[in-house]
Amino acid sequence: MSESKVSIAPASERVAHTCSLVDSVTRLRYVNANRAEALERLGILRVRDLLLNVPHRYLDFSHRVQIAFAQIGEDATITGRVASVKTKRPRPKMVIIEIEVVDDTGVLTASFFRQPWIAEQIHVDDEVALSGKVLFAYGYRQMKSPFYEVLSTAKSDSNDEARSKETPSKAAILPVHPATEGVSPAWMRRIMSAALADTGSVCDWLPSELVTKHHLMSLSSALREVHFPSSLDAAEQARRRLAFDELLSLQLALLARRNLELAGHRPFEHVIDGPKVKALIEALPFALTDEQNHAAQEILSDMTAPRIMNRLLLGDVGTGKTAVAAVALAAAADSSTQAAVMAPTSVLAQQYAQKIGPLLSLAGITWALITGSTSEEERQQIELCLADGSLSVVFGTTALLSDRMVFKQLTLAVVDEQHRFGVDQRTALRKKGQGVDLLAMSATPIPRTLALSLYGDVDTSRITKRPKAGAGVTTKLCVPENLDQAYAAISEAVQAGHQAYLVCPLIDPSDSEEELEDVPEAVRTNGKLYSATRVYEELSKTVFKDFTCDLLTGRLPEAQKDQVMEKFRANKTQILVSTTVIEVGVDVPNATVMVVFNADRFGLATLHQLRGRVGRGDFPGTVYLASNAKRGSIARKRLAALEQTSDGARLAELDLELRHEGETLGYRQSGGTTLKISDLYADADLIEAAHMDALAITAQDPNLTSDAYATLGIEAKDRFGIYFEELGYK
C-alpha cells in the first residue's frame, strides 16, 4: 500500500462503473468520506485491498434454527426481530451493548463487549441474524459476542442514502467480513458487490500452467465465490485459490530476499576438521548423541559447501543445541575467521557466554561478551580485538549491529530465537562480513509448514531427544482463588533448599489498567492483571516474608539485571519475581517451582519455554498455571494441552490447529508480512506446493522480470514489499 491517507475522488469519478484493482476505493459506488476512513482502519485503500479482504466466516441460513430449539452449548444461527438495544457501562473503559432478539418461539439476548458502535448499527425492529454458541442464564438463551448480520433495517442511515430500507438477503450463505466502526458486515457485502461489478473480469496474475497443475479456480471466479459463494465448498475452493496466491507470493519474496542478501558474495570454505574443533569436542563434559552429532555434521557440511549456509537448528529445551553451535564456532576459529552469536536478551547472551565461553577457552579460542551493560573501556578493547582479528568469537545482543562493531573477517553468524529479530536485523548482522553463513537456532519447535512460511528456503536440523532430561516437570492448572496450594509448594521447596519463580504478564500496576485484547474467549483473571512489581511488594512482605525475594523485569538497567540473575544463580535469592525476561536461556538447576499468573495471557511458546526453567537438575519441577479461563474455551484448551504433554513438537501442532492463523507458538510475521488468507494448519499442502513452485520459478527467473513471471513478481512485491525494497520493482 503506497498511499498513507485516503483522498476522496470527485463524485463523477466515483460513480464510474469500471475501475482497476489499483484504483482507490473512493472510485467505487457508496464509498463516501466516512466509509473511506473506516475502510482505511481495516488497511483497505485500494480496490484490490478490498477484494482480498476475504470473509472470516459464513452464515449458513439453510441450517438456521428457531430460538426455542437452539441447543444449549452448541453453535447455532438464528434470525429474529430486535426488541431492545441497551448500552451498559459496568466500569470505566468497558462498554457492553446488549440486544434482545425475538422470534415466534422465544427470546435470546446477545452481548457485545467493547464494541460501542454496534448500538449505531443495530436498531429496534431491525431483522438480524446471529451466529454463535448458545448459553443459558437468568432464564434466557444468550450469546456472547456472536457474529451478526442486519438483514433488514427499520431506520435509515444518514451517512449512506442507499442503506435505507434494505430488503432481507435471499442468499442461503452470507459472508461475514472483518468489521470495524462504521463498516458493518452488511455494508461490506454491498460494497464488495459493487467492486466486483465495477472491476469485471480481472487479469489473472498466476501463470495458467500453475492454475491447471493445482486444479485452481480462475482469479475472477475465486473472487466472486469467496465473497458470494454458491456453496460452502465453492467458498473453500475459492479461499484456497487466493491462499495459494498469497503463499506463492511469500515464497517468492523470501527467496528474492535471500538472493539479494547473498548477491555478489561467495561462500567461505571453512576448515571443519581442524585442531580447535577436535579440542572443543574433547572439552565437552559429555559425548555428543547421535542426533547432536548428525546436526553438527550437517552444519559443518554446509560450512564447506559451494552455497552460503542458511540453516535452522530446532531443539526443545535441554536437547543440546548449544553444544552443537559451539562446534560451528570452533570451525570458524580453525579457519582463522570470526563468528558472532546474537541473542534477543542480555540475560540469554550472558548465559551463552557462561556456557560456551569456558569450552572455547579450553579449545584455545578467544571470545568476549558485549551487551548494553558493557563498560566503555571494555567495549573499546573488544572493538579493537575484533578489528585486528585477535578475537575469534563474540557473544551479544543487538549491540553487535552497532556501526562501531567492525570485524576483520566475519564468516559465521549464529542467531538464537531468530523469530524475535526482524528481517533487517538479521540482514544487518550478515552485512558485517562477506558471504556470511547463517545458523539460526530456536528452542520453539515449529512444523515444517510454519518454517517455510517464516524463512522460505531454509535447511532444517532437528534434535528431538534430551540427553539429560532432568527430573521432569509437572504442569498444573489452578484458579487464582486456589493459589495457596502453589504458595505452599514454593515454601516447602525453599525450605528444602530449592528456589522458585513467580511470573507476571505486566511490569507495573499502572500497566494493568489496560483492557483485555478483543480476542475470542479472552477473560480477565479475578478482574485484574498481575504485575511483577505489585506481586513482589505484596508477597515479599506477607506470604514469603521469611524468604529472600528479588525482582527482575525488562525495564531494569542491564547491569542491575545481571546482578539480580547472578544472585539467583548463586542461591542468594530464593524467590525471583519476574516477567517473561526469564523465558529463554536462564539455567538454574536448583529452581523447582514456578507460578505463572494470568497464564491465559501468554502464548503456548512462552509458557512452554517458561516451564523449561524448572526441573532442570536432579529434582522434579512443578509449574502452576493460574487462570480463570472457562472450560471449553480456546484459552483453556491451550492450557490443558500444556498440562497433558511436554512434547514441544506436539504442542506446536496443537497450537497451530487451535489457532488456525498465521501465528503459532509465539511466531508472528513482522511488518508487512502477515498472512491474511492462508491457514497454516489447513493449507499445509499449499505451503509445500508454493515452496516447490517458487524454487522452480526463481531457478528460471531469479529476478522475476521475464514475460512469463513479471506480473507474478509485481504481485509478490505488492503483498510483501518489505522483502523487495532493494530489488527495484516498480
Residue ranges, per PLM feature:
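Upstream accessory/linker segments immediately N-terminal to the RecA-like ATPase cores of bacterial MutS
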Residues: 35, 88-283
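Inter-lobe coupling/hinge segments of SF2-like helicase ATPases
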Residues: 262, 294-297, 307-640, 703, ...
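Long, highly charged, low-complexity intrinsically disordered interaction regions
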Residues: 1-28, 37, 250, 260
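Accessory helical-bundle/CTD segments and flexible terminal tails appended to RecA-like ATPase motors
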Residues: 566-589, 594, 612, 616-629, ...
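OB-fold nucleic-acid-binding modules
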Residues: 53-77, 82-83
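Intrinsically disordered, low-complexity N-terminal extensions of nucleic-acid-metabolism proteins
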Residues: 1-18, 74-89, 94
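N-terminal cationic and glycine-rich segments that engage phosphates or anionic surfaces
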Residues: 144-146, 153-154, 428-430, 440, ...
